[in-house]
Amino acid sequence: MARVGPPLDRADERPEVFAMSPHPDGSTASRCGPTPSGFPVADRPWSVETHGIDVVPDGDRHGKPTDLLWLWSAANLGVIGIVYGAVVATLGLDLLQAVAVTVVGTAGSFLLVGVLGIAGQRGGEPMLALSRRLFGASGNVGPSLVSWVSLVGWETVTAIVAADALLAIVPSLTHGPAGRWSAVVALAVTTGLSLAVGRLGHATIIVVQRAVAWIFGIATLALVGDLAFRADWARAAARHPAPFGAVVAAASVVIASAGLSWVNVSADYTRYLPRGARGRAIVGWTTLGASTPLVVLVVLGYVLSSPTSTLASSPNPVEALRSGFPGWAVVPYLSVAVVGLLAQMVMGLYSSGLNLLVLGIRVRRSRTVLIDALVVLSVGGWFMVAPHDFLGSFVSFVELLACPLATWAAVFLVDMLFGGSRDEPRTAWPAGGSWAVGTAVGLLFTASPLFTGPLARGIFVGSSLGYFAGFLVSAALFAAVRAGTVVRRGREATTTRRSVSGELPPR
């Protein structure tokens, strides 16, 4: 049914309304069309975005695929990429293997993110809202809940690392230690900064990420250049090749840490693109923007580490890397680290808020990010203050969610290959069943500190290949179902056509 509410002239005065359907969209009735600034009233920089999970009308579509280059570049400037490189080093790969695994794993996984982004440009809805066309409103609860927990979980981990970096700036400037409760204050600052941008919405995020990509991208390049100049490249080049199993394990780690962790948000940032935007441009700029900084950081992390390095297992990787810089570069390094991590948080916070709307939380989009920020602040504050060792287990739990996210992406990708679903299905069992079976199979082959499946043996030990097995199973099952549906409909159409033409007697 149509949304209600008269169009008003000012976006900040328009009451946000919900679609008259079982799920809210958190949208606001808006006047379509661009303002003199080139942005539509519903999505202007430094104003609260008024669309929720409703379909973005053609009059509100704006931007170009090259915007994705800066958006994804900023999101992958975080120093966590250096830690991924350290993990690759601990698996014993030589330099050539490490570079190949990093390039192929990073570009390949973000290629999937770019392809899924085409669905957002075509459908005009966020990622998990589009998923309802496959799973149905009730069947989509599972994937949406997994997506939300994964996003909020990684936001919490990122906020903690950013807060640690912010705390490290204090003794660098004052030559004194930060207080015990300073950790909570630092966490509140990092979360608050992310909230301020995420609350405003899509257009503001695009503008901010572009600035971050340019300004802090150059700063990151300078700091990376300093590290690369002082790195022991001869030691890295002298390493011996690792066996095939180690290469596969390293590739699985890179894929899971790179694009796979973003598959559930891709359409959130392409739904405003004009319908005339080319799909190849969406895929290309997404892949290039995300892969370029991350490949550089991962390879650098590999060179800086050794098979016995403690960087990969450090509870505070920012502090561990800090010792590699001269005194004058410590504060600039920490500042760049904080901003790079905040750029990741902003995108996660915005998308997790959209996920809450898909789950049926009946509040404005601009308020869903506040709910997520409170969760991040509460959970993150507990981890930073309380004396416990649960953070490692929490990270392992969030990493486990890569399996159901991968299987969901497999189902969605297959549906796109078959032309996409335009309406919610009569039954959700084909998509939901394929997702559930693939997830179960993937977990059977998964090995992690928190959970080890009964079939996680051989090459599956010490790798993240479980999600890959689940991906293949879900894709194969759903492809078989969709192919069967296409064949059946083709036969029905042929029978109907022959009946109408008189070749067959009527039933």
Where are each of the predicted segments found?
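Transmembrane alpha-helical segments of multi-pass small-molecule transport proteins
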Residues: 144, 172-199, 214-225, 255-266, ...
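Transmembrane helix-loop boundary segments of multi-pass membrane transporters
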Residues: 89-100, 104, 171-181, 203-212, ...
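Membrane-interface "cap" regions at the ends of multi-pass membrane proteins
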Residues: 18-95, 246-253, 272-281, 485-507
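C-terminal membrane-solvent junction of multi-pass transporters and transport-like membrane proteins
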Residues: 55, 215, 408-480, 491-495
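Hydrophobic, membrane-embedded alpha-helices of multi-pass small-molecule transporters
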Residues: 65-82, 224-231, 239-304, 327-346, ...
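Membrane-water interface regions at transmembrane-helix termini and the short interhelical loops
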Residues: 90-91, 117-118, 134, 142, ...
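Hydrophobic alpha-helical segments and their helix-loop junctions in multi-pass secondary transporters
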Residues: 159, 164-167, 214-240, 255-260, ...
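Selective recognition of specific alpha-helical transmembrane segments in multi-pass small-molecule
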Residues: 78-81, 104-112, 147-158, 215-227, ...
